[in-house]
Amino acid sequence: MPQKTSETPMMQQYNEIKAQYPDAFLFYRIGDFYELFNDDAIKGAQLLELTLTARNKSADDPIPMAGVPHHAVQSYVDILIDHGYKVAICEQMEDPKKAVGMVKRAVIQLVTPGTNVDIKAGAAKSNNYITAVMPHAAGYAFAYADVSTGELKVTDLKSKFALQNELSALATKEIVVPEELTDDDAGMLKQGERLLSVQPDAEPTSEGSYVSQALTDPAEAAVVQMLMAYLLNTQKRSLAHIQKAVAYQPSAYLEMDQDARSNLDILQNSRTGRKGDTLLSLLDSTKTAMGGRLLKQWLDRPLLDIDAISVRQNQVQDLLDHFFERSELQERLTKVYDLERLAGRVAFGTVNGRDLIQLQTSLDQIPAIQDVLGKLDDGSFKALRSKMDPVSDVAGLIRRAIEPEPPISVTDGGLILRGYNQKLDSYRDAMKNSKQWIAELEASERKATGIHTLKIRYNKVFGYFIEVTKSNLDKIPEGRYERKQTLTNAERFITPELKEKETLILEAQESSTALEYDLFQDIRDKVKAQIKRLQALAAQISSLDVLQSFATVAENSHYVRPTMHAGTHDINVKGGRHPVVEHVLGRDSYIPNDVIMNHDTDMLLITGPNMSGKSTYMRQLALIVIMAQAGSFVPADVADLPIFDQIFTRIGAADDLANGESTFMVEMLEANAALSHATASSLILFDEIGRGTATYDGMALAQAIIEFLHDHVHAKTLFSTHYHELTSLSDSLAKLKNVHVGAVEEHGNLVFLHKMMPGPADKSYGIHVAKLAGLPADLLARADTILKQLEADAPNKTAPAPAPQVEEQQLSLFEEPKPTPKNSPILTKLAKFDLMAATPMDAMNFIFDLQKHLKKK
């Protein structure tokens, strides 16, 4: 911003700093407030509901201004971050009272959506990931980190599809990108209101080199270096807690795209946008924040390695079999605080005394947790017990040094225990003795003057003084005191002896406070040196917490251990239940169902009425698969499952109206993801494909998709449909079987059995469902009449056919017989038209030609 001739030195300083952060709100510290100026003030006042005022109001060009108190700044920063903005925190770097000229100021941190480490209530079990994407000739190098926990991972993705899946899985709010980025890539990355932050090319940093030293892929190392450079530029402090980058491959886990995650309500309810009534909420009996975060990661990335799955299952079984040991473990875990984020605050330099007490309390639980592990049978627990480091030296240091109930502030004293430092104790003794001297002086002055209400007080303006009420002033001996201040009802006095003692007290107090802060910083640095040990312990405790959670939920919900097999794709689930629906309805009200798909069945074609449970049945299988491959027990009587590599879904009319995509377009995009990427080891759930377009278009597409999946993909597929004509495909597709959700009519009413039965449904019961929905009786009667007429007119064919024509209700007595293909050229032409091979445009042109011929007649 160009300098104005009328700018004050302070505004000149502000503008120079603001020019370095043009895309951020600059919170400029002045005394006890952070001030916003110019456009920041105008926009900030609106977003933060602040009073907009002005600096130099009487000038021709007053400067818009708004401010927030320094003690409440974080809440205002959080609001701006939630709106997707960045905030630069500009602090006074020297005491204004001691400054010569302008107070020095500098930005100490740039807070961004991906780097905000302030954890809101209710978000302790969530990660805040910042990601980095670096395009290259063969794909995209991709890294992500959680600044609050130190987690850092990296991979190399070969396609936009894979990149979009990773971004959706991490729910990232900010992506760091290089300066050279195509418009196409930028548009893709911005989807979902993500913030793109450009990191210019820079020399590798020592921190970036350290965390990337184990990486062998140059592209992965480069994207990690870019991300670390951005974090150093924004955080402007130690990042010692950021762990060495771990390379991973998404293909090593069960992959799900954004549609599958949304449709299955794994981590977030697709209807409410919240955690409630999700698979995560159901399985979350974790006792620690870090355990809750790891549970999310396990559900988001189920395993493919059958041996690794078996290890988790064995551990869950062992905890399930040892109720009392599990209860003791849970009791100890409830006293373990968030070790990952405590380590992060230590590295950042923001840890306070209470944080250290939380750390000590957590570490004090480890010996008892080790004892529990020693009582369990599984060998992995005994190995974990021997590897677990209780970090007792850190716990002992904090126990010796920090007050059990310390203040929040680290600069005002009261932090360090007596006995930890001899010099500090001497300062405290001096203060204590001096204060005792003052108490004795007060008593002696009362005796000498006879004024029993005489008091020695202290304030920051006058220091120590003697206060005498006006009614007792005549009792003071002449020349005994020096008058300092006159009040309405009292006089304040000092003596040379009192001021001398005051100097000693204040010097001791100031020295004591300064020494305490120095000692605290030294303690913090000693803890900081052990961050890697604390992070290793946190990972072990997190894993234990998730395993006990799986065991607890399995016991409470009557889950069974699934059998996992490799080599075949057979599915054998007996008495399966949808875990979330069962939880909502209650176990006694839920009707279980089997899913049997052996080597001779790749596809179940599901028919039945609306609201009968087709979608629930399909989701049920997918959730059982996810739970099993995450290592959890599952809601079933028996579950024998293969290892699935991917899950694809098309469930519900998830219109993307904001992006101008219709229901049918969403259907086709989601279907195409499965058709393009599924393998024989994938699981596909398609619900009502084709309903978003004209009847025969939809039926034709549905049949073509079924045939393609059956003949070319060979994935296990559950395909529900209202096109009953498609059920005849079982005659020509050897590995397709029909099943339906049972329903019966009783006294004209429809009763859903919610039970899956072999064979196709005999009808859809659509009018009965409309009756349940409360449609008017006259309307339902009319619909029933039309339905019977349509059924009477429809050709008796088992394959998809052209839509039946509704005849006029009143016909001429002398009406000519209907033409047949033998005597009608148009009908002959229509009969020969290959609907399955035609595109929608071909069909429209064909109908247009027929209309022209008919109009000529």
From Swiss-Prot:
GO terms for cellular component: cytosol. One of its GO terms (molecular function) is damaged DNA binding. ATP binds at G608, P609, N610, M611, S612, G613, K614, S615. Disulfide bonds: none annotated. Gene3D superfamilies: 1.10.1420.10, DNA repair protein MutS, domain I (3.40.1170.10), MutS, connector domain (3.30.420.110), P-loop containing nucleotide triphosphate hydrolases (3.40.50.300). One of its GO terms (biological process) is mismatch repair. It comes from the Bacteria. Keywords: ATP-binding, DNA damage, DNA repair, DNA-binding, Nucleotide-binding. It holds the Pfam family MutS_III. InterPro entries: DNA_mismatch_repair_MutS, DNA_mismatch_repair_MutS-lik_N, DNA_mismatch_repair_MutS/MSH, DNA_mismatch_repair_MutS_C, DNA_mismatch_repair_MutS_clamp, DNA_mismatch_repair_MutS_core, DNA_mismatch_repair_MutS_N, DNA_mismatch_repair_MutS_sf. PROSITE patterns: DNA_MISMATCH_REPAIR_2. Belongs to the DNA mismatch repair MutS family. This protein is involved in the repair of mismatches in DNA. It is possible that it carries out the mismatch recognition step. This protein has a weak ATPase activity. This is DNA mismatch repair protein MutS. It comes from Lacticaseibacillus paracasei (strain ATCC 334 / BCRC 17002 / CCUG 31169 / CIP 107868 / KCTC 3260 / NRRL B-441) (Lactobacillus paracasei). The gene is mutS.
